[in-house]
Amino acid sequence: MSEAERHRAKMEKRKAVQDAEVASKTIEKGLLIVHTGTGKGKSTAAFGLALRMIGRGHRVGVVQFIKGAWHSAERDALEKFGDQVVWHTMGEGFTWETQDRERDVAAASRAWAKAQEMMADPAFALIILDEMNIALRYDYLDLNAVVAAFSNRRDGLHVVVTGRNAKPELVAAADLVTDMTLVKHHLSLIHI
């Protein structure tokens, strides 16, 4: 048997296994996805999922818990899709900028109320809770109540939670967790 024939036979077997695996996955449910870790790209990865949902004709909701007036090109791009994307920036800035726990707790509570409202709205297929992990890390929200709300969310709703230091309870409840690891970042290469 030639190398090309061996390769073809190997790939035919692999295809049969893959096809069987895909065929066995018949349950459609919404996923709870967590993007965490010290690396960059957690929010950007979530916004990539938003593009996939928009491409399928679904509506996406975004609630930003921390970033405040932080401007992003991702927001500019997603807002070009009109009412397919509803964006709420609820935070008042990074916690080291506000330095006011009471204000941060109030902002996180407002953001969580908006998130719950959007999660209950069947018009949305995906809700992105950007930097919610930060609000949970500093106990601005009741972790048990948040996890319970995610566990009891309506069928078919996908929820993505981003931010560093995801709580173990949230990780345990999630269907998919990605830990972004910083290997190299261009900002560390700039010498001022």
Where does each model-flagged region fall?
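Extreme N-terminal, non-catalytic leader segments
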Residues: 1-31
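Conserved P-loop
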Residues: 33-120
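Conserved nucleotide-binding/hydrolysis micro-motifs of P-loop NTPases
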Residues: 66-69, 93-95, 133-134, 165-168, ...
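Short loop/helix-cap segments at secondary-structure boundaries that form the rim of catalytic
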Residues: 79, 168-173
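Phosphate-binding/switch loop-helix module in NTP-utilizing enzymes
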Residues: 99-155
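Structural recognition of the conserved hydrophobic beta-strand(s) that form the central parallel beta-sheet
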Residues: 158-163
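A short helix-turn-beta junction within AAA+ P-loop NTPase domains corresponding to the substrate/partner-engaging
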Residues: 172-185
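Conserved small/polar residues in nucleotide/adenosyl-binding loops
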Residues: 190-192
